[in-house]
A protein has these predicted regions:
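Glycine-rich anion-binding loops and their surrounding alpha/beta cores
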Residues: 2-215
Length: 215
């Protein structure tokens, strides 16, 4: 088992070449929806899709596209800002299908796996604003490289077992995904995720996979 990343420029250059046009258009295009289903890396046996959505109309669209694209399972999470992690407060809504089954809806309660946070998500890093880094009127005036470095630091701390919203997000997202794909209880899935993090196994796996990819 491992993980990998292939840059769009490498696996679909014509699509990547539209980046400048899409930036100038600003608005979300249909390409933003369908490009997550390309899946340049496929498993030998089963391939699962995990993606996020915001608007209620998206789950059936993603589900139908995922089946056409050949995904054995699709897990569609109503995530914070369209990401794959649900809000840490309140029930997490998830749509999913497995095999030839129809799309189903379910909810996960973070409190049932001992996650009780007052915030919806991991707070953004507190960085000083800088002059000259804004690209336009809607972009941030935070240095992107500094932001990325601080975000990575928060993620590594979570993998090191530091309690807080980042670790809770890993547990919550991992547990709901594992419970659906492996068809086990939410609590059992959370227990496995917590054990992997607290034992250091998750961090070792993360670093070993990076080393293999770089090599």
């Amino acid at each position: 088992i491992g993980w990998a990343y292939i840059d769009q420029e490498k696996f679909c250059k014509p699509l990547y070449d539209l980046v400048d046009l899409r930036t100038r258009m600003v608005k979300r295009t249909i390409l933003t929806t369908i490009e997550v289903l390309v899946g340049p890396i496929r498993a030998k046996n089963k391939t699962h899709l995990l993606t996020g959505y915001v608007h209620a109309a998206y789950p059936p669209v993603y589900s139908n596209l995922a089946k056409v694209a050949g995904f054995d399972t699709a897990v569609l999470v109503k995530g914070v800002e369209g990401g794959v992690s649900p809000a840490l407060r309140g029930d997490g809504k998830v749509f999913y299908y497995s095999g030839n089954n129809e799309l189903q809806e379910t909810k996960f309660d973070p409190k049932s796996i001992s996650i009780e946070q007052n915030m919806r998500a991991v707070p953004l890093p507190n960085l000083d604003k800088q002059e000259g880094v804004k690209l336009d009127e809607i972009s941030s005036d935070i240095n992107v490289e500094d932001f990325s470095a601080k975000t990575s630091e928060i993620g590594i701390e979570a993998l090191n077992g530091k309690d807080g919203p980042a670790k809770d997000t890993l547990i919550y997202t991992g547990a709901l995904t594992l419970s659906i794909i492996k068809n086990i209880s939410f609590n059992e899935a959370a227990s496995q995720i917590k054990k992997a993090i607290n034992s250091g196994k998750a961090k070792d796996f993360f670093y070993n996979s990076i080393w293999i990819i770089i090599k």
